[in-house]
A protein has these predicted regions:
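Helix-loop junctions at membrane interfaces in 12-TM secondary transporters
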Residues: 44-56
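Transmembrane alpha-helical cores of Major Facilitator Superfamily
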Residues: 3, 7, 34, 57, ...
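Loop-to-transmembrane helix entry/capping segments in MFS-fold secondary transporters
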Residues: 80-90
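A membrane-interface helix-boundary motif in multi-pass transporters
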Residues: 107-125
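Helix-to-loop junctions at the C-terminal end of transmembrane segments
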Residues: 11-25, 109
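Intracellular juxtamembrane helix-capping segments at the cytosolic ends
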Residues: 65-78
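Structural signature of the two symmetry-related core transmembrane helices
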Residues: 27-42
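Multi-pass alpha-helical transporter architecture, strongest
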Residues: 121-154
Length: 154
């Protein structure tokens, strides 16, 4: 199943990025997070290899949208002289999540049930979607590149 994720990242990422870069970053990130949340939550409802494989495909499509688009958003809102700090804090958040997730997941597994881990991921994802939808309504949170450097093109 992890091989599916890796193969999709290698062979599908460019096409997804080519499509998503045409749109505003916050709504695209929200859509990607919704797909990601659905993929995580679907694990709680699936049985057997095919079900878990389908969950991975759905989750990976969300990942292919969220990771580069959110990174672009952070780079765009950061002043050029603070871009490294902004990206550092952004990736620190990812690192903290990866550090705390096994502890929280283990507690959910022991206290409630294994499916609670995936339902918890769904709830966190939907909360993120709600937050992104709220932020996208305020123009001051819309991203515009803050650098005098020309944009990077593939």
């Amino acid at each position: 199943i992890p091989t599916t994720n890796a193969l999709m990242c290698v062979f599908v990422q460019y096409s997804v990025t080519h499509i998503t870069r045409r749109y505003k970053t916050l709504p695209v990130t929200a859509i990607g997070m919704l797909i990601y949340a659905f993929g995580v939550g679907s694990v709680a409802m699936m049985n057997g290899f095919q079900g878990f494989w389908l969950s991975m495909v759905i989750l990976t499509f969300g990942e292919l949208i969220v990771v580069p688009t959110a990174s672009k958003y952070v780079a765009d809102i950061a002043p050029a002289n603070l871009r490294g700090r902004y990206m550092g804090v952004y990736w620190l958040g990812w690192g903290l999540a990866r550090t705390l997730a096994p502890l929280i997941g283990g507690c959910l597994n022991d206290a409630i049930a294994p499916r609670a881990i995936w339902i918890g991921g769904l709830v966190i994802g939907l909360t993120s979607v709600t937050g992104l939808a709220i932020l996208s309504r305020f123009p001051r949170f819309h991203s515009t590149p803050q650098s005098d450097l020309p944009p990077v093109s593939p």
